[in-house]
C-alpha cells in the first residue's frame, strides 16, 4: 500500500471525564467551542481534520511549520476563551512527522500511533513535538518557541 508523508497533530482535553462530570449539561457546549476553536486554527494554517472523536482531534498538515503555527494559535485561543463556570479547558497536543497509508477507514500506520503517544505525554496547555518533526523545524520556529 502506498504511503504519503504528513505532519500529524493530535489533540486531547486533559481530564475530560472529570470536567464533563463537573459541567453536566454545559459539557456539550464546551465540546462545541473546543472543536470550533481547533477547526479555526486548522483552517487558518492549511490543516485537514482526519477524524474527531469526543474530545480528541487528529489532523494532518503539509508542513511541520504550519502544524506548529496551528497548535500555537489553537492553544492561545483555548487559553483566552471564556469557558463556563470559571473552568479552564486545558488541551494537550502532540506533533509528529512521518508516513501513513490512506485506507478506507482513514490514515493508518505506525507513525499515526506514534503521533497519538506523543500527544499523550503532553500536559494540558502544552505542545510536544517529536524528534522527527523537530529536526525539520530547527531553523524555522516562531520567536519564543524552542
Residue spans of the language-model regions?
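Catalytic NTP-binding/metal-coordinating core of nucleotidyl cyclase/transferase enzymes
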Residues: 1-70, 76-77
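Catalytic beta-strand-to-alpha-helix segment of the class III nucleotidyl cyclase homology domain
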Residues: 39, 58-146
Amino acid at each position: 500500500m502506498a504511503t504519503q508523508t504528513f505532519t500529524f497533530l493530535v489533540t486531547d482535553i486533559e481530564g475530560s471525564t472529570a470536567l464533563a462530570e463537573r459541567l453536566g449539561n454545559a459539557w456539550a457546549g464546551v465540546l462545541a467551542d473546543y472543536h470550533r476553536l481547533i477547526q479555526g486554527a486548522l483552517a487558518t494554517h492549511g490543516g485537514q481534520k482526519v477524524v474527531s472523536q469526543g474530545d480528541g482531534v487528529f489532523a494532518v498538515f503539509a508542513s511541520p511549520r504550519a502544524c506548529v503555527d496551528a497548535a500555537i494559535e489553537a492553544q492561545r485561543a483555548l487559553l483566552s476563551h471564556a469557558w463556563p463556570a470559571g473552568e479552564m479547558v486545558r488541551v494537550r497536543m502532540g506533533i509528529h512527522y512521518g508516513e501513513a497509508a490512506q485506507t478506507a477507514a482513514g490514515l493508518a500506520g505506525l507513525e499515526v500511533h506514534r503521533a497519538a503517544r506523543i500527544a499523550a505525554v503532553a500536559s494540558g496547555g502544552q505542545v510536544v513535538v517529536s524528534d522527527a518533526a523537530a529536526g525539520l523545524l530547527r531553523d524555522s520556529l516562531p520567536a519564543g518557541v524552542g
